[in-house]
Amino acid sequence: MRNVLLTGAAFAALLPACAQAQTVPPSATDTPGTAQAPDSAGDIVVTAQRLDQARNAILPSLGASEYILSREALDNQPGGADRNLTQVLAQAPGVTLDSYGAIHVRNEHANLQYRLNGVIVPESISGFGQTFDPRIADSVSLLTGTLPAQYGYRTSGVVNLTTRSGAFDNGGDVGFYGGSRTTIQPSATLHGNTGNLNYFASGSYLQNDLGVENPTASLNAIHDRTRQYRLFGYVSDILSDTSRITVFGGTAIGKFQIPNNPGQTEAFTLNGRSTFDSAQLDQNQTENTHYGVAAYQYAGGDLNLQIAPFFRYSETRYRPDPQGGDIIFNGFNDRSRLSSLVFGVQSDGSYKATEAHTIRFGIFFQNERTKSSVTSLFFPTTTDGDGNTIQATDQTSSLTDASRKVGQLYGVYLQDEWALTPALTFNFGARFDAVRAYTNEQQISPRANLVWKPMSGTTFHIGYARNFTPPPQELVATATVMRFNGTTKESAIKFGDPVRAEREHYFDGGVQQELAHGLTIGVDAYYKIKKNLLDEGQFGSSLVLSPFNYAKGYAWGVELRANYANGPVALYGNVARGQEKGRDIVSAQYFFAQDELDYIGNHYIYTDHSQFWTGSAGGSVTIHDGLGTLVPTADLLYGNGLRADDPAGIVPNGGKLPSYVTANFGIAQNFDGPGFQKGLSIRFDIVNVGDRIYEIRDGSGVGVGAPQYGARRGFFAGIRKTF
């Protein structure tokens, strides 16, 4: 029997009972009957459920920690179905909230892997748009810790969105949500079936005046309008009681104004103009992502297989101020277009060799073509009589740098789930990965997890994972740096080594205890040893991050969690202590000042996204009030503060921003009356109830761009009708 530690949200305070730590069921596979297509809705439900169980048995999370939110849990939180994925995941244990919609799991920068029904969807070009809409999911899970061998590449966490299954009733819903900062968010879903074919579609639109975090503490940002569109479609055809084919895909389009920070000081003269109001800048960025997956699944007795070809196209465009205002402040501007086209295939399988051994295996291949085109305007420079560098003319020069790269990722894994006893499971294996792009590297990565359940409700786990994380392909070639010598875009550092893959030793252990009356508590501890630690920073006007490496690094942390679910009440809470440090920047050195390189070359420093303490809590109560159900919800988020410049000006990232606590409140009335009231839901939410003014970033630190403040208090309301 397989017992797996799936740790959920801790101290669960207002998400429903399904947002909790769970234990993965044993990976036994049902023996199918005659291979023929089901001929009734009931047969479809049973077959789909069994195929889902078989798919989950292919990709279990043995020995890792998993935070799971069901559809009910996603709906029963402040914001409900209209909450974005970042806000949902920020409530998970050990997750740090950052600017630009980013989160850091266990103090790692990005390094998150997104999957739909277990199939990897390649990451989009780094920006701040949200590719996935939680409303498409029947459940959302975050997997962390020492991952089994089937999980490679991005390994700080795996976010898996599982779509609904079974025979879809014909119906759907339509809703509208809006409020402060001119928020308008209509959405709709449609689902149904015809014969053995099920379909589901979702669409949403979001407009508000807080597309990117406000660089000032004011209630409303200047020049911060966003328009975002998301579409998703899913079709599944059950071919027989042992096989099905599923096709799904989506589109995310985001248009963002870059918010302005008034009162900035001009430093250059453009065409005789040396003054410009920084509140009037007009910089914009658009992000487009399209993805699709076709998955064939076979579940026949002891053998389960899934093969899934996929594609993803992502594009980011940045447009500077058309009047050249940013040139007057910075001495240059960039108009950029970055694109990435990915085709690949993922195949996974499991075979139950004996009662004690389940063998899992798989391959992965991805081909990516990236293109970059950056047109820069800048001033030529000269020196004055005192030897100071000054602009030689107020007329700009132009240079376009275009590059392209085709790269590949290869992966293969094999592992064995060995049931040593009914209470003790040992999962061990290895994977081989190779990258052929800006860097040519490969690694064999052993993985091992031991899970022990000495008694009902008690689970211990300990694990080790060797990880290999290739850098993203949107890299800057060193040749571009030299082309800007003698201009206002000249870099102080004239060289940059290529970005390398990160290599990591990961150790993790923990225990989970299920107590009486629905209370579960757990603790998890980890330690990581890193070579070529990957980090990313914002080094230009565009809000696209660029990667670089520290030669060495390490991270450690401890997570405490608890949740309570009993009847109508669900509560959770988490607290985590952790940190990450790196030493000696060994790639993309042209992004940094010489004094930074000198200090970091001889000292460990905190990475800019390292936060000592994080915490979250929340809960919900379901009240049957005669009209249906009344569901008040609340949650809070605590951050100890991300890194900033050293107040003494000595240690990079040697300072820290002030800590903060924000709380959100919501209440929803779900009607269950006759006629139009059937399926009707209305809700009201308050974000940042105390109107806490807090900085996520202050604009200082290694690779940090402009200041960013958290959202001020906002009031929102919504209505949704299910049909």
Protein language model annotation of sequence segments:
Residues 637-645, 669-723:
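C-terminal beta-signal and adjacent terminal beta-strands/loops
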Residues 85-88, 103, 127-128, 142, ...:
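N-terminal periplasmic accessory domains that precede
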Residues 419-421, 521, 525-529, 548-645, ...:
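Gram-negative outer-membrane beta-barrel transporters
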Residues 119-145, 233:
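Short acidic/polar hinge/loop motifs at secondary-structure boundaries
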